[in-house]
Amino acid sequence: MRLTRVTLFFIVLILGLGFFRLIDYLLQDLEFQTLQATEESMVDTANILASYVETEGTLAGLSKIFDNSYNRNIEALIFKQLKTNVGLNAYLTDDKGIILFDSGYPKNIGEDFSKFRDIRLTLAGKYGARSSRTDENDKNSSVMFVGAPVHKDGKIVGCLSVYKAQADVLPFVQERRRDI
């Protein structure tokens, strides 16, 4: 009888530890998967906006697009989270990485961003993306950046990067963690 109880105890213990590891894995992987999905849609957006700049050839239209989108009344209930504003920004550089337009921080215009990974790699014809913190001590202050090349006559003449604060996505992650 004693052997049966000990065996049963170890079976329950092993199953409990396995279940705990599974839940722990799912919870840890959830944020990573959510950020991957966000990055994927940012790649699309960056390329659409880069194509727009190639087609239109002016910054005025790009500025107007962002101004209009920031002034829209948004009430989108997405998985129990209410979205009320556009959380995506973009900047455009020339072929040297100098900022020509920044929808979120116009004071950056004229700054050299060529050292940043999203710009440097995109201008070199590769996939350029990065994540940077606005406050090194706060892991929730990360901002995701994804670049797309702007072409003219077959040459890369600039980079259009879209950027989004990870804090915009974290409420979805937290809600899913509660659900799990």
Residue ranges, per PLM feature:
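Juxtamembrane membrane-water interface segments immediately C-terminal to a transmembrane helix
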Residues: 14-17, 25-51, 69, 175-179
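Short N-terminal helix-loop-first-beta-strand/juxtamembrane motif that initiates sensory/input modules
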Residues: 77-99, 127
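Glycine-rich acetyl-CoA-binding "A-motif" of GNAT/NAT acetyltransferases
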Residues: 156
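Extracytoplasmic/periplasmic sensor domains and loops in membrane signaling proteins
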Residues: 66-72, 98-100, 104-140
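A short beta-strand signature within small-molecule sensing/ligand-binding domains used
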Residues: 139-149
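Extreme N-terminal signal-anchor transmembrane helix of membrane signaling/transducer proteins, especially
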Residues: 1-26
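Extracellular/periplasmic ligand-binding regions of membrane signal-transduction receptors
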Residues: 36-72, 95-100, 104-105
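Helix-start (N-cap) segments at beta->loop->alpha junctions
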Residues: 136, 151-153, 161-178
